[in-house]
Curated annotation (Swiss-Prot):
Gene: clpX
Subunit structure: Component of the ClpX-ClpP complex. Forms a hexameric ring that, in the presence of ATP, binds to fourteen ClpP subunits assembled into a disk-like structure with a central cavity, resembling the structure of eukaryotic proteasomes.
Residues binding ATP: 126-133
SMART domains: AAA, ClpB_D2-small, zf-C4_ClpX
Classification via Gene3D superfamilies: 1.10.8.60, ClpX chaperone, C4-type zinc finger domain (6.20.220.10), P-loop containing nucleotide triphosphate hydrolases (3.40.50.300)
Lineage, highest ranks first: Bacteria, Bacillati, Actinomycetota, Actinomycetes, Mycobacteriales
Keyword Chloroplast tagged: no
PROSITE patterns for the chain: CLPX_ZB
SUPFAM superfamilies listed in its UniProt record: Glucocorticoid receptor-like (DNA-binding domain), P-loop containing nucleoside triphosphate hydrolases
Identification of the protein by name: ATP-dependent Clp protease ATP-binding subunit ClpX
Keyword Transmembrane listed: no
Origin: domain of life: Bacteria
Record's keyword terms, sorted: ATP-binding, Chaperone, Metal-binding, Nucleotide-binding, Zinc
Organism: Corynebacterium glutamicum (strain ATCC 13032 / DSM 20300 / JCM 1318 / BCRC 11384 / CCUG 27702 / LMG 3730 / NBRC 12168 / NCIMB 10025 / NRRL B-2784 / 534)
Gene Ontology cellular-component terms listed: HslUV protease complex
CDD domains, sorted: RecA-like_ClpX
């Protein structure tokens, strides 16, 4: 009976349940007790969380400068220097703004805080000029979640197609459903020129894939708390939603805007119709980027974007067509260039891949003829190299494959040099 009374009188840790005899120290606080082991565990948790917070703060303090952002873009993207400068400054200011918003309220003076408004980006330029790759590279440098959406797949809510909230779901997925990370991410919306309304004047008929989509995008571009269905698709009752604040998400909206140059030319007094008009030449097409530099909001309105939508995209960057020399540089110079990638694949089969200068020029010319820009280079390389890569694993006698201009044109077979015995595995 005495032992039972003694056991009942033993004090226990309120957290782990161990008695005072099972631990070294038991500290009392009111009707609550905590043992030395639980205190040690709490200290470890606090140190870990403080360490992570300090690491996050350090990362924020190491925001790259515009010159550093542009230099990083140079290692992956050829040319487009004016666009790189504009994007570097815009992205730098955007993430400076986020840091400023995190420190609001920490100042001791009574001066009102200056509110920094978000500046989303509009990119104008032809297909295959590097718009998407520029945005991807920016996200890679900043280590933030990145999502790509195609504006042509979007429709106004209630119609067949994707809701604009599905764009936000893609960003959440890229962030592994970490809401805090997603709210600092970048969303790239391509083909936005394809959702221009059918006429400059408002229509009484519904334009569910044009003006309707622009209207639906307005709120998420400016900043709103959106309800995202975790599984995607349409919203329905009794469904759980993820709340995502888009205020600090950077939107980069892009399109080729074919025909916009005519709108700008008309405004500048250059006639686009009539027998006396000169036929557009390749040289003039190459100078489209110079015309785009003169774009005004009124030109975009005439093209088919609504004024409210344009107002959410204050930063405008233009990218130009890539000429032959630029495309050859795209093939060879970037850190992950196509030539370097295919050389690595051939190395895995114990062979050296060599391109002559005229081969690279021919590949660039084919991309220009197809009007696919840098985007079409991989398809051309595949057409040339697939037959070789099919046979190469069975050809242990081949040590080097040489691609010249005739091979690139499909007029000759590649030159295959015999492997040196020490260099080729059996």
């Amino acid at each position: 009976m005495a032992r039972m009374q003694e056991s009942a009188d033993l004090l226990k840790c309120s957290f782990c349940g161990k008695s005072q005899k099972q631990v070294k120290k038991l500290i009392a606080g009111g009707a609550v007790y905590i043992c030395d082991e639980c205190i040690e565990l709490c200290n470890e948790i606090i140190e870990e969380e403080l360490g992570q917070a300090q690491h996050d703060e350090q990362e924020r303090n190491e925001l790259p400068k515009p010159s550093e952002i542009s230099a990083f873009l140079d290692t992956y993207v050829i040319g487009q220097d004016p666009a790189k400068r504009i994007l570097s400054v815009a992205v730098y200011n955007h993430y400076k703004r986020l840091r400023a918003s995190e420190t609001i309220g920490r100042r001791r003076n009574d001066e009102p805080e200056t509110e920094l408004v978000k500046s989303n980006i509009l990119m104008l330029g032809p297909t295959g000029s590097g718009k998407t790759f520029l945005a991807q590279t920016l996200a890679k440098l900043l280590d933030v979640p990145f999502a790509i959406a195609d504006a042509t797949s979007l429709t106004e809510a209630g119609y067949v197609g994707e809701d604009v909230e599905n764009i936000l779901l893609k960003l959440l997925q890229a962030a592994d459903f970490d809401v805090e990370r997603a709210q600092r991410g970048i969303i790239y919306i391509d083909e936005v020129d394809k959702i221009s309304r059918k006429s400059e004047n408002p229509s009484i008929t519904r334009d569910v894939s044009g003006e309707g989509v622009q209207q639906a995008l307005l709120k998420i571009l400016e900043g709103t708390v959106a309800a995202i269905p975790p599984q995607g698709g349409r919203k329905h009752p009794n469904q759980d939603f993820i709340q995502l604040d888009t205020t600090n998400i950077l939107f980069i909206v892009a399109g080729a805007f074919s025909g916009l140059e005519k709108v700008i030319a008309d405004r500048n007094g250059k006639k686009g119709l009539g027998f006396g008009v000169e036929v557009s030449s390749k040289k003039e097409e190459a100078n489209i980027v110079d015309i785009f530099k003169d774009v005004l909001p009124e030109d975009l309105v005439k093209f088919g974007l609504i004024p409210e939508f344009i107002g959410r995209l204050p930063v405008v960057a233009t990218v130009s067509n890539l000429d032959q020399k630029s495309l050859v540089k795209v093939l060879t110079e970037p850190r992950n260039s196509l030539v370097k990638q295919y050389r690595r694949l051939f190395e895995m089969d114990d062979a050296v891949l060599t391109f002559t200068d005229d081969a690279l020029e021919e590949i660039a010319n084919q991309a220009l003829e197809r009007k696919t820009g840098a985007r079409g280079l991989r398809a051309i390389m595949e057409e040339i190299l697939v037959p070789i890569m099919y046979d190469l694993p069975d050809r242990k006698d081949v040590g080097e494959v040489i691609i010249n201009g005739a091979v690139a044109r499909g007029e000759a077979e590649p030159e295959m040099l015999e492997a040196v015995a020490e260099e080729k595995t059996a």
